[in-house]
A protein has these predicted regions:
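Intrinsically disordered, low-complexity regulatory segments
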Residues: 2-8
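Conserved ATP-binding subdomain of kinase catalytic cores across diverse folds
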Residues: 8-98, 103-214, 262-458, 469-471
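Long, low-complexity segments enriched in small/aliphatic residues
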Residues: 187-261
Length: 471
């Protein structure tokens, strides 16, 4: 592992050279290597084994989402890919990694000022880890998503390469900036959209961004997520994905109490000035929420908070387990896994949620709390249309470079990546090969369902496809 602390004392040109020197022990072409299939083990066994701490009654929802396509399988199989990546050689350069860096964990969300921001938006698996792991998972997800959208294998591989190239070029730009400028930099999605070559697709994207910028970010979710029943604010039930804790779903009466207790305890982890804001609201209702693909089965609840004048605030409490990267990258320094997620998000995002905090329940389980965002801004589904997926690939690659540069050494990484396309081609080769592995793993999941080994739930149509964001 490279001694990053010692390197920080060196000027940028020396750090670039140190990165270049790493190619001797970790050639860039070696990033094309795939995990050995002999002795790899059954990926379905690994998924089942690592699901023992999840809510077992929700696992059929998880399997139903993962079985939809090889792409959705990859989204839910972060633990499988982490094991595979852990067996491959690395450069030794570590960053605060996303840990689950597939393309649906990027998107547009509203900043506190209401401006649309494109960034990473899921951090359940974040941990200090080799920078290549995030790049490779993103590239593999692009290959599978492109194929799922009807692109040829060669075109899908080109999209993965485009994302890696954007990562390399953006990292080189960041390496030339002073630390303060690099830290506060953000990806200008509007400027990048202007680079879309297809005129119709470019105009469509610019119109969508203009609409997002005009969308209010405050209580806009209220009519969709809640209503007033006899004057009482209440979260809408949308079974089987959002529902209240009742005698049938919570016979012990503990789930609702747990959620309310966690919202109370979480306040103490907020910055003191943020507590003044939270204290203006009172908790009016809580409901259970099934989330994402990879997170299905973890405890997650929505809290509807109301101020004295009826203005709403939606907070979400979500269970945090150890990162899937931990067995291969090392454990988190934080005792509470919720704190691990919060610190990772604050590190990786340019503009983080001001309501981020964490808590633990009496059973020693860990959780983090965040504001429930307006999904119309957060969803990446519209960017995944076939005529814009190449633009989205470039956008994700550049965004990931910015995120990694905040905790990693941009000059060191840029020195390792260099100015040629050697790294880009190697990761594109890896992505194409790993997409085939994921497709084979997906076939094993389908067989396990067909054999009755795994039971799948009957989901609403909107819960099955690639447009469901955030794991």
């Amino acid at each position: 592992m490279t001694d990053l602390t010692a390197l920080r004392a060196l000027p940028a040109d020396r750090r670039r050279q140190a990165g270049k020197d790493l190619r001797d022990s970790a050639p860039r072409s070696g990033n094309a290597a795939l995990p050995a299939m002999k002795g790899r083990g059954d990926p379905i066994d690994l998924l089942v084994t690592t699901s023992t701490q999840r809510i077992q009654s929700l696992l059929p929802v998880r399997w139903a989402r993962m079985v939809a396509s090889p792409f959705t399988f990859l989204r839910g199989a972060a633990t499988v890919m982490a094991r595979d990546l852990g067996e491959l050689p690395v450069s030794g350069i570590r960053v605060q990694a996303s840990g689950d860096c597939h393309l649906m964990n990027f998107g547009i969300y509203a900043s506190p000022e209401g401006r649309p921001v494109f960034d990473l938006n899921d951090f359940d698996e974040t941990l200090s880890a080799p920078f290549e792991w995030d790049v490779k998972r993103l590239a593999a997800s692009l290959v599978l998503a492109a194929q799922d959208s009807g692109h040829s294998p060669s075109a899908a591989k080109d999209m993965a390469r485009a994302a890696v190239t954007a990562y390399r070029l953006r990292m080189a730009e960041l390496a030339d900036l002073d630390p303060l400028t690099a830290w506060s930099s953000r990806v200008d999605i509007a400027a990048m959209a202007q680079g879309i070559t297809d005129e119709a697709a470019r105009e469509k994207e610019m119109a969508r961004l203009a609409e997002a910028a005009a969308t209010p970010s405050g209580g806009d979710d209220f009519p969709r997520l809640a209503n007033r029943d006899g004057g009482q604010a209440r979260i809408r039930d949308v079974p089987p994905l959002i529902y209240h804790f009742d005698e049938e779903t919570d016979r012990q009466g503990q789930a609702a109490l747990r959620a309310r207790t966690l919202f109370t305890r979480y306040r103490d982890t907020l910055p003191e000035e943020r507590r003044f804001l939270v204290d203006r609201y009172q908790l009016a209702d809580v409901a259970f929420k099934v989330v994402g693909v990879g997170s299905v089965g973890t405890f997650c609840a929505i809290g509807l908070f109301i101020d004295p004048d009826g203005h709403p605030l939606f907070l979400q409490v979500k269970e945090a387990m150890a990162s899937v990267l931990a067995p291969y990258a090392g454990p988190s320094p934080y005792v509470n896994q919720g704190q691990r997620v919060v610190v990772g998000q604050r590190t990786l995002q340019t503009v983080s949620d001001g309501f981020l905090g964490w808590a633990a329940d009496d059973a020693g389980r860990h959780f983090y709390i965040r504001q429930l965002k307006d999904r119309r801004l957060a969803s990446a589904g519209t960017l995944m249309e076939s005529d814009r997926l190449d633009f989205y690939a470039t956008l994700c690659g550049a965004t990931l470079a910015r995120a990694h540069a905040r905790s990693g050494d941009a000059a060191l990484i840029a020195g390792y990546l260099g100015t040629s396309e050697t790294f880009d081609d190697a990761v594109a080769d890896f992505a194409a090969g790993y997409a085939e592995i994921s497709a084979a793993d997906h076939a094993l999941l389908k067989q396990a369902v067909a054999d009755g080994r795994l039971v799948v739930a009957d989901l609403p149509a909107k819960g099955k496809g690639k447009g469901k964001k955030g794991d």
